[in-house]
From Swiss-Prot:
Region (Mediates interaction with PRKAR2A) location: 462-483
Composition bias, Pro residues: 49-60
Descriptive protein name: Protein CBFA2T3
Residue numbers bearing the Phosphoserine modification: S603, S607
Region (Interaction with ZBTB33): 120-217
Protein family according to the UniProt entry: Belongs to the CBFA2T family.
Amino acids binding Zn(2+) 1: C533, C536, C553, C557
Organism of this sequence: Mus musculus (Mouse)
Coiled-coil residue windows: 465-520
Main location: nucleus
Segments for region (Nervy homology region 3 (NHR3)): 462-510
Region ranges (Interaction with HIF1A): 151-243
Zinc finger residue ranges, MYND-type: 533-569
Amino acid sequence: MSQASTTTLESGALLSGPRGLQYGSPAHRKEKAAAMPDSPAEVKTQPRSTPPSMPPPPPTSSQGATRPPSFTPHTHGEDGPATSLPHGRFHGCLKWSMVCLLMNGSSHSPTAIHGAPSTPNGFSNGPATSSTASLSTQHLPPACGARQLSKLKRFLTTLQQFGSDISPEIGERVRTLVLGLVNSTLTIEEFHAKLQEATNFPLRPFVIPFLKANLPLLQRELLHCARLAKQTPAQYLAQHEQLLLDASATSPVDSSELLLEVNENGKRRTPDRTKENGSDRDPLHPDHLSKRSCTLSPAQRCSPSNGLPHPTPPPPPHYRLEDMAMAHHFRDSYRHPDPRELRERHRPLAIPGSRQEEVIDHRLTEREWAEEWKHLNSLLNCIMDMVEKTRRSLTVLRRCQEADREELNHWIRCYSDSEEGKKGPTPISARSLNSCSGPEGSQLDVHRDFTPRTLSGYMPEEIWRKAEEAVNEVKRQAMSELQKAVSDAERKAHELITTERAKMERALAEAKRQASEDALTVINQQEDSSESCWNCGRKASETCSGCNAARYCGSFCQHKDWEKHHHVCGQSLQGPAAAVADPLPGQPDATASPSEAGSAGPSRPCSPGPPGPLDAAVPR
């Protein structure tokens, strides 16, 4: 069947509306048989020809006691067939029943495994949602889960293509809704409501139970692929969107692995972990072995390109109708796998369309066991090579350390001999003893050095001790040299400081002397000046009456300066004053100056009289 016909049929099955073909009629069965040549109807022994208006046939003795299914007669002149699911349990494989539900809106499943017959073409008004949702909890074969995933992906692809046929905008909205549903951001009810709002076409009522029953399988597959790719489910879905919305693409990871998680009490088990613990070969689960008979199709079991035969092939009586239907279903999709595909079947990430939709048997074949033993043998050989290389490296390192230790002992002996030579000359007796026992003594030293090492093996403590002693000796010498250099530097610094201090003191003394000389020069200049006071240096207004040369600002400065001035005062007038005193010996001179009185009494040169009044000599 081509992709276009699949899309047309499925898009027509999704929407409820008037149908031109009568469901359950011979023409309808003829058209359906022509559309699906691989239907299990080819291998059934009792084809159904009951018209929809007849009640269901009574249960036979082989089917056991079952609940009588409710049946509502229906005519097709109204709005198409009734939109509810029949009572009863479906076929364990669930392939053709759900395909017919999606395609034609009728139940065309084979006889149920557990004995409950399904209604041929009628639809009951019972709780179809609960009965359909309970299908996901039944222990179905892994291949059935793979087919359910394939149908769900085809259903979502048909939805997206139907929206794209309406308009590109609606197709984009439908694609966003599908991605949100798979990504768990939308619930099934929200998806249903928004899809109906986007397309203005209502879906059939069995779509919601179908999604509730099969959407968790697709979400588990998405989560498993995302974990293998080390991504979040949203990231993985964004990168591999074509795997979901492309009808020709296959799943990148085998979906039977995900279904095994559901069938085995929800335990997550990857292929590697299953191979390690070997739990799938546990003989305590016979029902599990009976389920494993459905993991591979008969064509794949008998394929000559699979290498060695399966260790425990199921006997021929265990083939059932499900296996035959599966062989018909996978007749085109399965081809003989090539050895390269067998080697690469455990790779989680593959190019879309490069792998077939197959179910992997986790039990190891003899070839895989041989490869495992080969890998283990190569691993052990690598470990042995590493151990041998390590042992050789340790031997070489030990020899090098022994050579270094011998050289270190030689240098230590040379150093000790040089130290003894520095301390003083060796006594004659000791020197003769050393000369007599030269080679023998050296041999004894070597024997003494190596005897405990040969007894105790490798002793690094002595080497470290001698090396530390040599290093400490070098440190001591370096410290002594450093102390000498520091002391010399300190001595030179002190000498330099002393020299600079002496220079500074001499400079200060010279500056003080120069300052005193400058002060004396200023004083002398002030004394020579006739405009300033000889005592204080201020502007002079009076003149000494004795010498008529000294200038003072007042009588206070004159009396203050008299102790120094009386030595020079009147010397220039001493001769004329004596000549004046001779012709007038008896005349009292009321205005005689102190210099004249001093000259009159030469016997008292050191006790001059008080200075005369200034106003007598200074004109007013």
